Amino acid sequence: MNKRIININDIIPNEEYGIIRRNKRREMIEFKKFRRLDVGPVASLYFESRETMIYQIQEMAYVEKITKQELNEELKSYNPLVPDGRELTATMMIEIDDPLRRKNFLSRLGGVEEKVKIVIGSHQIYAESEKDIDRTTREGKTSAVHFLHFKFNNELVEAFKNKNNMIQIGIDHEEYGHLSIISDKVREELAKEFI
């Protein structure tokens, strides 16, 4: 069982959160600084943690003024994105401002969620997407947002932590092939998710 699961007691009541909200936002901006990686010109991966998920839930609860019962339902949706100690989880966003260009681009990117990978030496770890809803339609159009899991074994965790190994994150879709090298700062930050 994932000991990092978020429960209702981890969420501050809205009245209290409103007082500290501005400071929490500043803290989270700093915390996320080395958790984002651009892969090509329009795709970005935002690597999640227990802290980022609590912040997102807290913000949603505050803005939408949801009830405790609704909050319990939201926890069921958010908890699968908390890394379990042997994985990295990420929200991948395809960010194109122009709506027409975005629609056209996404219509050619079906199945992209199955083509995202972390490369460590000769090892490739392909993402597994959240199964909550299909992110690609039968017509081949994909969503602009994907929730991804990269599963690691002990050997891959050690390889990830080893600073002598170059780590790349890529997408090898036929319509969008890009590879990015992660910095030592990003590696160091993401390695905190492994227990």
Describe each PLM feature range.
Residues 1-87, 95-195:
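Long, contiguous binding/interaction regions
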